């Protein structure tokens, strides 16, 4: 995947595009493997964003206020890839 930075929403949209492309087109093996690798990277990134959001929600539900934790998502969907 390119070195450009993506928000969660951008990464998810690209992941959906990659999946459609792999499902609906006949690609050469090398190109299909490249897309598959990009999809795996995007999937891991999106999963990480969701896990961090879940941590924030759990903290808010437990304490009623948000506390800083190392590595936590700091601002909504501003996390970038």
UniProtKB/Swiss-Prot annotation:
Enzyme nomenclature, EC number: 3.1.11.6
Pfam families in the record: Exonuc_VII_S
SUPFAM superfamilies: XseB-like (SSF116842)
Main location: cytoplasm
Highest taxon above the source species: Bacteria
Example GO molecular function: exodeoxyribonuclease VII activity
GO BP annotations listed: DNA catabolic process
Signal peptide, first to last residue: none
InterPro entries membership: Exonuc_VII_S, Exonuc_VII_ssu_sf
Keywords: Cytoplasm, Exonuclease, Hydrolase, Nuclease
Gene Ontology CC: cytosol; exodeoxyribonuclease VII complex
Compartments reported by the entry: Cytoplasm
Catalysed reactions, as listed in the record: Exonucleolytic cleavage in either 5'- to 3'- or 3'- to 5'-direction to yield nucleoside 5'-phosphates
Family: Belongs to the XseB family.
Quaternary data: Heterooligomer composed of large and small subunits.
Function: Bidirectionally degrades single-stranded DNA into large acid-insoluble oligonucleotides, which are then degraded further into small acid-soluble oligonucleotides.
Protein name per the record: Exodeoxyribonuclease 7 small subunit
Source organism phylogeny: Bacteria, Bacillati, Bacillota, Clostridia, Eubacteriales
Gene (UniProt): xseB
